[in-house]
Amino acid sequence: MFFEVFRPWRLAACLLAWGAAAHAQTPAATPPGAAPASVQALYQQHCAACHGAQRLGGMGPALLPESLARLRKPDAIKVIQDGRAATQMLPFKDTLKAEEISALTDWIYTPVKPAPTWSDADIAASRIETAGWKNWPAKPQWQADPMNLFVVVEGGDHHVTLLDGDSFEPIHRFSSRFALHGGPKFTPDGRYVFFGSRDGWITKYDLWNLKTVAEVRAGINMRNIAVSGDGQWVMAANYLPHTVVLFDAELKPVKTYAATTLDGKQSSRVSAVYDAEPRKSFVVALKDIPELWEISYDPKAPPIYDGLVHDYKMGEGIAKPGFQGVRRTPLDEPLDDFFFDQSYAHALGAARPHADGSPSGQVVNLDARRKIATLPIAGMPHLGSGITFDWNGTRVLASPNLQDGTISVIDMKTWKLVKNIATPGPGFFMRSHENTPYAWTDSMMAPKAKHIMTIIDKRTLEPVAEVKGSPGKTLAHIEFTKDGKYALASLWEDDGALIVYDAATFKEIKRLPMRKPVGKYNLYNKISKSEGTSH
């Protein structure tokens, strides 16, 4: 069961890596006339694979009263019965009896005893460091362009492959922590990559020496991580506990922030954290509190004045240090995810879908610290996978939609809709590159079209081609080479592959068998902040 919109690689491992509990597309039904199983046994059979044996989360979020506080029980029952299309959660109405669903719902709203905790002492005690790593050679110990390196996360068997972006040959393959978040983060020199796992582990890996440097567990159920633009800081966003944790570059804990309102009366899961390099800060979205936080790693950051302060004269407010302090921006509603415009002056985020179908996208000015516009995108825009590019003399945003087969194009000066581009079905990822006139997007949320990749001309905003995989198999997540000449897609299956396409002719060039390559990330495009990929 899933009660959040979450990255689909979580689903990938849920359905295929956990044996009997995730054996097939439809779980085994309770035999007719059989005595009702205990609720704990039902949970272990149908839910534990994704949400953890103790309900503390894994591929899916934690199922605890505090994490379900905003979901009413009748709505939870409906989710279990009907599934949730946005996360590809399977429906259980034909698998479980009504009384079993009701019992499961009641049970996940009861507290876990003893209550799960993860303290600063636990974080510090979890840290592991490889001896002698500071003496390792300061250059790549392999022959390839280190800037055209791809890091490929294989969710099928929890491995990472390092791929030469020129020859498309693997350089190295190593095992990873379970259920990595799909977005590894790189240091600006390209030497180190940081991985975050859903069960809270952060791994620092030396790409030049092909060895793990250090690991630490930031929480029990972690959303994602960010690395500062100068490579000196790492921040983790947790669902459980409700914290944001700051580390130095060696993964030594520096500070833990309780994700609460200013008065401390309400706490929240943390939706996401991203680095805003030009601002020398991390920006944090809270899932249950309508606030956006900015935490500066600039020692010269101006002081913070909480509350209604009209100017900064003595007596108007008590200042807090700006360096590593929390600067709060109040919102109308919480954001599930967000990304930045190219100037990093604005955060573009999406709240949960509104019941009346009205747009839920928001534009937040980080300097004015307030919402300045509503994005005219209905449904469930996946802004975190949107891209920006120039069109007809203006900058536009193009965003896929988790609910509709539509790419919405928004003018970033007026925040008005330019065009809706139809696709075969709802999609998750959209990617492009400065050196190509085309953008690629998937339809992986559409059962009958998940094998189709749509190619859109950025000059005309029209679809010009489709790339198709085998029907019934998911083709998703494009990433370009450093020069933009080739596009790499994932055949998102346990017996899957990494498929290399010519970005100009759309012809397949090469296919490398891989175990569910849920994401691949070009080092140069990431550290150079390419407009065609996520950062």
Label every PLM stretch briefly.
Residues Q25-A37, Q44-H46, L90-G156:
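Flexible coil segments in periplasmic/lumen-exposed cytochrome c-class electron-transfer proteins
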Residues T30-G33, A49, Q54-M59, L63-K113:
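Extracytoplasmic electron-transfer domains, predominantly the class I c-type cytochrome c fold
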Residues G132-W133, P137-P140, L180-K185, N221-V227, ...:
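Repeated scaffold domains used in trafficking and secretory/extracellular systems
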Residues A144-P146, P188-D189, G229-D230, E277-P278, ...:
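Residue-level detector of Asp-centered blade-edge/turn motifs that repeat once per structural unit
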Residues G165-S167, D206-L210, D248-K252, Y297-P299, ...:
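Short loop/turn segments that connect beta-strands within beta-propeller blades
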Residues E169-S175, K211-V216, P253-G264, G322-P330, ...:
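A short beta-strand motif characteristic of beta-propeller blades
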Residues A218-E291, L308-V326:
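Asp-box/WD-like beta-propeller blade repeats and closely related beta-sheet repeat scaffolds
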Residues P426-G496:
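Loop/turn-rich, solvent-exposed surfaces of beta-rich toroidal or solenoidal domains
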